[in-house]
Amino acid sequence: MVTGHGTGHHGQSPVRVPLSSGAPLVEATFASRPSQFLVEAQMGGRMVRAHLADRGRLTDLLTPGARLLLASREEIGRKTAFQVVAVYQDGDLVSLDTQLPNRLVAAALSLGALPQFARYSRVQREVQLGPHRIDFRLSEGLDTCLLEVKSVTRLVDGIAVFPDAPTERGGRHLELLINAARNGQRAAVVFIIQRSRGCAFAPDVTVDPAFSRSLREARSVGVEIYAYRCPVDPSGITLGQEVPVFASFAAVPFELRQH
């Protein structure tokens, strides 16, 4: 279950999108996570509360004392004045913005930087399919492709793994792609590794066995699976190198793992 198509830059300027839509960022120190979507952090000698969009467990990343990047969110009606944007782990900046991969892929599609999808001139986002939505529908005349994008932040021995918590929603998205492929429609999923490290990708069967099974089934019926390692810095995320995709962590060659 290995795929490879290259980054498709061909000398072009790198595809980049800003963190948090370009909002000013401030540094803080992680203190606690009282609930799934709430983080408490020390900033300038005071405790602040920040919204966290990532549904994952993030136990490897959100450790006491971890350096965070927060964006100020002063909109009326918000319960928190800040948004968690990213966290440093061993010097590697990891984006925790789950919508950033979609913005990055949208930019890459518009610039033709993903050659496997370059033939489609029309790009629709957040397309309703029955009770569910798919991230992108690409089309060129009657030729269409359904494309789902997933955010990856966790590493195990240098291998990017997904999910970080059981994801029924992710499983439903795979079912949409599986059904499309069975009906003769092109379908693909792109895993965006939101950090500069991660030399390969694999589903984490220990976290969500059902998702891992669905991903194997998707591959078997023709759903295309890609993964890109996308470096993050305080100014943005860059579409980086495509990395190999494996059916499971156990299938990753030992020499690719970092101990």
Curated annotation (Swiss-Prot):
InterPro entries: SfsA, SfsA_C, SfsA_N. It holds the Pfam family SfsA. One of its GO terms (molecular function) is DNA binding. It comes from the Bacteria. Belongs to the SfsA family. This is Sugar fermentation stimulation protein homolog. It comes from Chloroflexus aurantiacus (strain ATCC 29366 / DSM 635 / J-10-fl).
